[in-house]
Structures are given as structure tokens and as C-alpha cells.
A protein has these predicted regions:
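NAD(P)+-binding Rossmann beta1-loop-alpha1 motif at the extreme N-terminus of oxidoreductases
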Residues: 1-70, 95-96, 100-101, 131-134
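Rossmann-fold dinucleotide-binding core
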Residues: 11, 102-151
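Flexible, active-site-adjacent loop/turn segments at secondary-structure boundaries
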Residues: 14, 76, 86, 125, ...
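General structural feature for long, well-ordered alpha-helical segments within catalytic domains
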Residues: 15, 19, 23, 43, ...
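Short, glycine/charged-enriched secondary-structure capping and boundary segments
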Residues: 26-29, 49-51, 82-86, 111-115, ...
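A short linear-motif detector with a strong N-terminal bias
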Residues: 32-33, 47-49, 78-79, 118-123
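Rossmann-fold NAD(P) dinucleotide-binding segment
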Residues: 58-70, 74-121
């Protein structure tokens, strides 16, 4: 990973629905440089107004982030954002990639393997707590993946 400390990590966040918007907002409020992407830009505007950077594609988010977090709707959305020539795996630079979408174990294993081939670390980190937990920064996060990446 390209980071020297957690406080200077450039974070990318993809997926600004009910949960993602609050989660990204907490990262921004904590002082992290934040690059954002969402299918509908208007969901990002409040965070952009507070200093986050809008990116036109997931690839742009990945290219400028040390850590990329995805919180999208469905496993098929995860595949679209992570895989392919415009995905985050192909465009990140030695990054930590974290998927917080509720998905399948098989997809998590596949993404971790693809990320490793691309020179990245990947963690599967679905959350529990709903929109209230996200708003109040009280989500429970169940993390799976390489212990070294988690540290």
C-alpha cells in the first residue's frame, strides 16, 4: 500500500446510497482526502460541497487513492466496479481495496484473487447497523481477508 500513516491515506469511496453517503461523510469529517464516485452525481454533491473530490468513473477514483472502499447495491454492481479495464483493480496503484457491500463468499474470494494479481490487497467487509448506524458512525463491520492487509 502507498500510505505512510492512516491519517494521510487518500481514500476513494464508490457508492453513495443511504449507507455510503454517511460513511463517506464521516471519513471526510475526520480529515481524510476523499475522492468520490456514484452513478448519480447529485448524491455526491453535499460531500463535494464540503471538500470531497468528484470523479467521473470508478477508474479515476482508483487511480488517485491509496484505499478504495465500495458500498454498492448488489454483487453485480461490485463486479462492474471492481473488474474489467475500467474497474478499480485495473486502475489502482498498489492499493487496499475494501468491499463493504453484502455479497457472496465466492465473490469475495474471486475479488481477493483478482486484486492480488493486480498487486493490491483486498478485504471483504460487510456491515450491520443500517442507515441509523451509518449516520451515527456505529456500524458493526465483519472483515474477512488477509490478516496483513487488515493490519
Amino acid at each position: 500500500m502507498n500510505t505512510t500513516s492512516n491519517t494521510t491515506a487518500r481514500i476513494g469511496f464508490i457508492g453513495l446510497g443511504i449507507m455510503g453517503q454517511s460513511m463517506a461523510g464521516h471519513l471526510l469529517a475526520a480529515g481524510h482526502p476523499l475522492a468520490l464516485y456514484n452513478r448519480s452525481r447529485e448524491k455526491a454533491q453535499a460531500l463535494v460541497d464540503k471538500g470531497a473530490q468528484w470523479c467521473d468513473t470508478p477508474a479515476q477514483v482508483a487511480a488517485q487513492s491509496d484505499i478504495v472502499i465500495t458500498m454498492v447495491g448488489y454483487p453485480s454492481d461490485v463486479e462492474q466496479v471492481w473488474l474489467g479495464s475500467e474497474g478499480i483493480i485495473a486502475n489502482a496503484r498498489n492499493a487496499l481495496l475494501i468491499d463493504m457491500t453484502t455479497s457472496s463468499p465466492e465473490l469475495a474470494v474471486r475479488l481477493a484473487a483478482e486484486a492480488e494479481k493486480g498487486g493490491h490487497h483486498a478485504l471483504d467487509a460487510p456491515v450491520s447497523g443500517g442507515d441509523v448506524g451509518a449516520r451515527e458512525a456505529k456500524l458493526s463491520i465483519m472483515v474477512g481477508g488477509d490478516p496483513a492487509a487488515y493490519q
